Amino acid sequence: MEHIMNPFMSPAYLLGHGPHSHQHVHSHLPSHPQPNAASPASSPGGSSGSGSGSAAGSGTGSGSSLKPRRWGSPPINLAGQFINPATGKKRVQCSICFKTFCDKGALKIHFSAVHLREMHKCTVEGCNMVFSSRRSRNRHSANPNPKLHSPHIRRKISPHDGRTAQQFPVFSPGTAAAAAAVAGRLPVAFPGLLPPPPPHHGHHPYVMFGGQAGLHGLGLLSTGCQDPDSGSVDNEQDADPEDDNDFVYVDMQANSSSPAASSEDQEEHERDNEQDEEMHCSLSLASSSSIAADEERAADQPLDFSLHKRRKSEQDREQEQEQEQEREREAEKEQEQDVESDKEHEPEQEHELEREKRSPSDAFSMDQLLGKRKRHDSTASSSACSTAAASSASSSSASASANPPQTSIKMDLDPDSDSAYMTSRRQMLPLPVLDLEEHHHLRLLQTQMFAAAAAAAATSQAPPTAFLPAGSPVDLAKDSPPMWSLLSEMYRSMLLKTQHQQYNHHHQLQQQHQQEQHHHLTLSHHHQEQHHHLGHHHMGHHHHHHHQHHQQQPQQQSPAATNAPISV
């Protein structure tokens, strides 16, 4: 095997090799530090005389006729030779980047080109590409294509072009660990052999891709951090074309411990300009990495557009319901505080409030909630009951002052409570602002109605609890209509109502509130007036909302033709 004398080979490599006329066997030890070895390579023939006996690990006798059976010494065989079980072919593996080659010549070329490089940086400003030869660097710098000089936009390597990207070591884990330990000690013994650590290199893929972003997009690395010795997968030209048969290709470029990884395959690809059709931006991979992470989290669901939409609408609805629940609890606490202030005007009222906040006994119970749900559904389903419902609503608002906590338990599964919240906010606003708020609310309702219809189309047989939070112990009544149909009914009825009706209604209700509040404020102390205002606003808007809803029942039942295609 003739020597390839290269001006870029390191002095340590060239030390023992003069221009010999005969061929001889090298036991080349790239990553095995030996304290007494003058050079990492020596010949068994002893012609160079610079190596120690232990370095000549392959004693093959006549070096001129035989190829060496292995490089390196037996304990840590760093140029690892292994036999592919599928094809029976012998291959050698680079100990640093774990790529495999068909023979040692290819490995030696790879090693001197990739791991012994002298760096030539591109002269275009903003480009961090580094090359092992000036010729490659000059040709790269002369190319005006901006895609070559921007570090984030990479080219796709065809997985069938005969280059292996062997990602992980083929030896046993123990050997790999020992090799890693030796590689960690290397820079002390041979300064030129290993590249400096990644964070100092602007061109290193770790820096270029901002951590693991590219690999997340490929789905190949989880959130753990990158192995320092997990190998560079720069795709070399000198890996032989038989590699197609032997290995599964892992086509990725973002994981590398040699700083040459990115530059090397850039350089390779400049050489074959006819493959320019294959260019693509792996920036899109990096940018879609968050989406890919979400997909992995919900990987049990097939990637279907309608299912995605349904999942999103479920999450949105769960969040809405949780917010409604919190709102209900706050309103309730304030009303109960009002009741206590009516009953007892002693100074220990603050202790009472604290105790009540700590253990809200009747603040929120599922049974009352469900009873309310069933009653609400039964009145909503028949239009015949609507007059009775309206009268009962007015009577309950009359008895509001008698029993505040009971009436304040408005069920949080009732889909209207966010609109109730909006109307309550509207009552507290001055009247000119009302129009803008109203428009916003109607637009919001419209979009929610569309989302509900889409979700219904996606899950035509979904159980009525499809949109409830996952852990909620709610068992709805068997015959209750599904949640989305209630939603769409309610939204449509709210859209049918005109602005004028609401304006008049608010006027009447505000006068009514003011009378009630005046009556109640005479009972309470002066320092509790603010609490009182708030509580009665809430109470008033709850009853107003029930009243509103029952008033709209005949309107809801009328458009039966539009109702037909939506109903499950």
Swiss-Prot record:
InterPro entries named among the record's database cross-references: Disconnected-like, Znf_C2H2_type
Ranges of compositional bias, category Basic residues: 19-29, 520-550
UniProt keyword annotations, A-Z: Developmental protein, DNA-binding, Metal-binding, Nucleus, Repeat, Sensory transduction, Vision, Zinc, Zinc-finger
GO molecular function list: DNA binding; RNA polymerase II transcription regulatory region sequence-specific DNA binding; zinc ion binding
One GO cellular component term: nucleus
Zinc finger (C2H2-type): 92-115, 120-145
Main location as per UniProt: nucleus
Biased amino acid composition, Basic and acidic residues: 313-360
Compositional bias (Polar residues): 253-263, 558-568
Region named Disordered: 16-77, 134-157, 220-364, 391-419, 501-568
Domain of life of the organism encoding this protein: Eukaryota
UniProt cross-references to Gene3D superfamilies, sorted A to Z: Classic Zinc Finger
Skewed-composition ranges (Acidic residues): 235-246
Entries under PANTHER family matching the protein: DISCO-RELATED, ISOFORM A-RELATED (PTHR15021:SF0), DISCONNECTED-RELATED (PTHR15021)
Its job: Required for the establishment of stable connections between the larval optic nerves, the Bolwig's nerves, and their target cells in the brain during embryonic development.
Designated name of the protein: Protein disconnected
UniProt organism field: Drosophila melanogaster (Fruit fly)
